[in-house]
Amino acid sequence: MSASSAQTETPERYFLKVASANPFNPLILIDYGLPRAAKAIVRIYTAEGRVVNTLVNDTQPAGNYTLAWDGTDRNGTRVGSGVYFIMLETPEYSETKKIALLR
């Protein structure tokens, strides 16, 4: 599950942060910012580097965004407890955050 919403102020720089409790169950909120329009990709990876889910893969206007991930893979199947990584990628920037899901 993902929901993305742009907020009005434009950030001065790119960022990615976990906006809710970590470890999480059943939902985690993820904030990210784009200082200018860019192709943004936000993915969830396993600790082994396998893509679990792609939350965003689109050109987006500059702004602050919030995503929600409910611990499911791209097929909607619940993933198990464990360590996962959130990665924000743009042509100019990438950042990764470690998260933990406890079922």
Residue ranges and their predicted role:
Residues 2-46, 54, 66-69, 90:
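Glycine-centered coil/turn sites that cap beta-strands in beta-rich domains
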Residues 2-6, 59, 67, 77-103:
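C-terminal tail/sorting-segment detector
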Residues 52-60:
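Solvent-exposed serine/threonine-rich low-complexity stretches and specific carbohydrate-binding patches
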Residues 25, 36, 61-62, 75, ...:
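Surface-exposed loops/turns
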